[in-house]
């Protein structure tokens, strides 16, 4: 795979630097940017894709809603990034039944490009303090768990994907594969 430029949008989550390192370790050019970076500055970087990191609260999601609606690039939302994608397209987010980080067994419902090779079940590391409760209209439901019905989703026509779990942490089984799948999506786009 050729070297791609991936921008990691910092939503102030504790694992943002791990996302950056995981992408860098896959031999990609990567950079962390604030979630207040103007869209024109992002486009000036000529990235091949964006990853929206997790974060503590939606009030601090900066311009993420604008990014997912207005930037024509592959986007992967992780945890809060996943929730921001849902909200930007009319979905709903609520408090989860189980907050805090824990190991979760995820059932892959549709082995889409982003989840290729992860199914039928995968053990992941996730926080469910907040979670997507209702998919945006037309979005494809990709994975679920006993704790959270919407663990992963994708936009019906754009290369926009969201996962509730953290592929960048070592506790997540096949996390590197998910990130590699995203990079392959970026390369094809």
Curated annotation (Swiss-Prot):
One of its GO terms (cellular component) is cytosol. It holds the Pfam family GATase. Its EC number is 6.3.5.2. Residues 5-189 form the Glutamine amidotransferase type-1 domain. GO terms for molecular function: ATP binding; GMP synthase activity. It comes from the Archaea. It catalyses: XMP + L-glutamine + ATP + H2O = GMP + L-glutamate + AMP + diphosphate + 2 H(+). Keywords: ATP-binding, Glutamine amidotransferase, GMP biosynthesis, Ligase, Nucleotide-binding, Purine biosynthesis. Gene3D superfamilies: 3.40.50.880. Pathway: Purine metabolism; GMP biosynthesis; GMP from XMP (L-Gln route): step 1/1. The active site is at 79 (nucleophile), 166, 168. Disulfide bonds: none annotated. HAMAP family: GMP_synthase_A. Catalyzes the synthesis of GMP from XMP. Heterodimer composed of a glutamine amidotransferase subunit (A) and a GMP-binding subunit (B). This is GMP synthase [glutamine-hydrolyzing] subunit A. It comes from Methanosarcina barkeri (strain Fusaro / DSM 804).
